[in-house]
């Protein structure tokens, strides 16, 4: 996909501990013209959000997509920490659990919920709803 000169690709952080799934969906997003950084757990995601944008890519993230069940720092805790530092960051939660299963604690923190197994078309549609200026 060709970007107009005045539009930079939107930057997405994809957080998923299952490497095959993370890589596959990151590639799908890249094929749609998005820049995608990957993290395999919540701790790594915070490191990328805190330093990656300053050191590696010199650009802020536009969206976070995260699994709910992650090793180390659970997805709910990750969402709370993202909200504390970046209150307007849109977040898509992907999970094999129904949205009511983790409880209301996460409902305040995310913009979209996608049930696993992930339908690629549903993922792209959710991203486009949250990043509407991206064609």
Predicted regions and their residues:
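Alpha4 helix (beta4-alpha4-beta5 surface) of REC/receiver domains from two-component response regulators
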Residues: 77, 84, 97-115, 121, ...
């Amino acid at each position: 996909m060709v970007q107009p000169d005045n539009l930079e690709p939107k930057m997405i952080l994809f957080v998923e501990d299952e490497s095959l799934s993370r890589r596959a969906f990151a590639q799908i997003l890249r094929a749609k013209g998005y820049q995608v950084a990957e993290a395999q757990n919540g701790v790594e995601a915070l490191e990328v959000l805190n330093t990656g944008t300053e050191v590696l890519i010199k650009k802020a993230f536009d969206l976070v997509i995260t699994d709910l069940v992650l090793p180390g720092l659970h997805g709910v805790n990750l969402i709370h920490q993202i909200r504390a530092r970046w209150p307007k960051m849109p977040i898509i939660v992907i999970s094999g659990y129904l949205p009511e299963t983790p409880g209301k604690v996460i409902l305040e923190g995310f913009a979209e919920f996608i049930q696993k197994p992930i339908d690629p078309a549903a993922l792209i549609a959710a991203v486009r709803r949250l990043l509407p200026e991206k064609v």
